[in-house]
Amino acid sequence: MTKENICIVFGGKSAEHDVSILTAQNVLNAIDKERYQVDIIYITNDGEWKKKDNITQEIKNTDELVINDVETGEISQLLSKGSLGKSYDAVFPLLHGPNGEDGTIQGLFEVLDIPYVGNGVLAASSSMDKLVMKQLFEHRGLPQLPYISFLRSEYEKYENNIIKLVNDKLTYPVFVKPANLGSSVGISKCNNEEELKSGITEAFQFDRKLVIEQGINAREIEVAVLGNDYPETTWPGEVVKDVAFYDYKSKYKDGKIRLDIPADLDQDVQMTLRNMALEAFKATDCSGLVRADFFVTDDNQIYINETNAMPGFTAYSMYPNLWKNMGLSYPDLIAKLIDLAKERYEDKKKNKYKIDY
């Protein structure tokens, strides 16, 4: 059987750089190397692209993926041809956060006319920006918790007015979030005005725009979505925490979470969550994969929190485990995502790019 040549891209200029490397390690160890010949491109924190061909060995430590012993390559040349001597069948970007999950690199792949796994430019960018995402959800009629958003420049000029607005519109606790980061980077749970000001200062280190959301005592439920024009969903899973707030440290370092799959919910609530996940997928014009995150209260009120256009594939990650519960193994999930990338690319080729006069 002729192998398909795949390129996995990871790292990147983002606060989620290390998460991306961890995700790449997991995917490289799971991908079917009998079916795929896998090259890798590591993007350093400084934005340099470094490539290695035909990765066959198990990656035992993430340090093995920090490539320093090759020269920085010219981007279009690195992506133009794989180690099998032909164009890549697909590129698999495993980049989290700005410059990778936000539509930036997806635009590059579009310009270079390369099939790639995951969401397109519009879906990636709108799912990355929490304010834009919330506005699209609102237009679709999806229930959300109250929130406030503002820019760093606005806060510098109108700090007192903004603090008053938060105190008037929301009740503590609230969550302060950079608008364009994931993996809970820069997020703070604030129980009073002093913590609010500290959380705002922290979040503005990572982004020029913030979202402050109403806190709620609710269960955190997640649904995985997979597909292009006709997506499928999983049964919901629940994030059960041994900490007050599911932050970056508890997600990736401490292991202080448990994933209950499937979640212990009434059947009708589970079906509502699956349908809402599909609506969220459509609201941001997604393709490939999405994880939709929800809050569910004790009386089964449901609020959508966000969609994640590039959910992690680490050992702690909900997305692959949700599909495993549906009978789709990790290697088969990776293969399905690559097939979806090629399917979308072939569909795009049906478009006309010139007008016949």
From Swiss-Prot:
Subcellular compartments: Cytoplasm
GO terms for biological process, alphabetical: cell wall organization; peptidoglycan biosynthetic process; regulation of cell shape
Manner of cofactor binding, per the entry note: Binds 2 magnesium or manganese ions per subunit.
Pathway membership: Cell wall biogenesis; peptidoglycan biosynthesis
Keyword line: ATP-binding, Cell shape, Cell wall biogenesis/degradation, Cytoplasm, Ligase, Magnesium, Manganese, Metal-binding, Nucleotide-binding, Peptidoglycan synthesis
Reactions catalysed, as given in the entry: 2 D-alanine + ATP = D-alanyl-D-alanine + ADP + phosphate + H(+)
EC number: 6.3.2.4
Cofactor(s) of this protein: Mg(2+); Mn(2+)
Domain ATP-grasp: 134-339
Broad class of enzyme this protein falls into: ligase
Residues where Mg(2+) 1 binds: D293, E306
Recorded GO MF terms: ATP binding; D-alanine-D-alanine ligase activity; metal ion binding
One of the record's GO cellular component terms: cytosol
Family: Belongs to the D-alanine--D-alanine ligase family.
Annotated NCBIfam families: D_ala_D_alaTIGR, PRK01966.1-2, PRK01966.1-4
Protein name, entry field: D-alanine--D-alanine ligase
Highest classification ranks of the organism: Bacteria, Bacillati, Bacillota, Bacilli, Bacillales
Encoding gene (name): ddl
